[in-house]
Regions:
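Conserved beta-strand segments of alpha/beta enzyme cores
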Residues: 53, 96-98, 148
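Glycine-rich phosphate/adenylate-binding loop
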Residues: 2-29, 33, 112, 122-126, ...
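Conserved SAM/SAH-binding loop
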Residues: 100-107
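Glycine-rich phosphate-binding loop and adjoining beta1-alpha1-beta2 segment
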Residues: 50-94
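Active-site catalytic pocket residues across diverse enzymes, especially alpha/beta-hydrolases
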Residues: 37-45, 71, 133-137, 228
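Glycine-rich adenosine-cofactor-binding loop
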Residues: 17-47, 55-63
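N-terminal Rossmann-like NAD(P) cofactor-binding subdomain of oxidoreductases
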Residues: 48-49, 57, 120, 153
Length: 261
């Protein structure tokens, strides 16, 4: 049984509030996350004093290759992914979540968010988000950085999700490393990236397993439910492999992580 001391606890300031979430990306992982966040909002309202207000940002439109693996339909072809999914969620759940057809961080205010969730395809996109978060310096610009950064990523049959704390806060002595700290190679701009779009459903399924996004998103949502609904987590994410059926949790740091100067 895990020691109570080896857990990460949600800060008390998150009680009695609507937690502002920025969801970057509304494709494979992002659309699955958005649907799950709507369910999480319903659960939080029932068991706690918390709720969610989500802003979704994505500049992509629905293509034929997205059908099947992503929760879009033929009637959605050519439409904004962010607007299509957000309108559907708002209508079904009676919410007023916001969609931005654009890119983060250029078209949204990262500093206004409590949690940033990235469901992006490239290291460059993660670097841009990381730079925007790092630019939040309360003592100089009165900008409060997001308390958490949850990143999801996947390949053909495996994926991972990692939650971190970009900055330490007064009521949270330690923090969780972010995805940029777990994978410092993401900062290397010379690394080649494969973000070529698929042209058909068959090609998309050849590049990625049909349910890999759903599996990664479900595990990430379960972690968020423990953190926001139960108040603590015992791990910081996991590596998942659909081909082998294995899940390897990412342990919490054993000592507080110092914030880089």
């Amino acid at each position: 049984m895990q020691s109570e001391a080896n857990r990460h606890y949600l800060r008390a300031s998150y009680d009695n509030k609507a937690i502002k979430i920025l969801l970057v990306g509304c494709g494979g992982n992002g659309a699955q996350m958005l649907m799950g966040l709507a369910s999480l909002d319903t659960a939080l309202r029932a068991i706690s004093s918390r709720s969610l207000h989500v802003t979704v940002v994505d500049d992509d439109t629905v293509s034929e290759a997205n059908l099947g693996r992503q929760p879009f339909y033929p009637c959605d072809l050519g439409n904004s992914k962010a607007r299509t999914m957000t309108e559907r969620i708002n209508l079904a759940h009676g919410l007023a979540w916001k969609a931005v057809h654009g890119r983060a961080p250029a078209d949204v205010n990262v500093a206004a968010m409590d949690i940033v969730i990235t469901c992006v395809d490239t290291a460059a996109a993660r670097r841009a988000i990381g730079a925007a978060i790092d630019a939040c310096e309360p003592e100089f610009h009165n900008l409060q950085p997001p308390a958490y950064w949850l990143d999801l990523g996947n390949r053909a049959t495996d994926g991972q999700f990692i939650i971190g704390c970009p900055k330490a806060s007064g009521d949270q002595p330690g923090r969780l490393p972010t995805v940029m700290e777990y994978f410092p190679e993401l900062a290397d701009e010379s690394l080649a990236e494969d973000d070529a779009p698929s042209c058909s459903v068959a090609e998309a399924l050849d590049r990625q397993s049909l349910f890999v996004n759903r599996v990664v998103a479900s595990h990430a949502l379960a972690l968020l439910f423990d953190l926001l609904g139960r108040g603590s987590i015992g791990h910081a994410g996991a590596f998942l492999n659909l081909a082998s059926g294995q899940a390897l949790p990412i342990p919490l740091p054993t000592a507080p992580v110092e914030v880089a100067a």
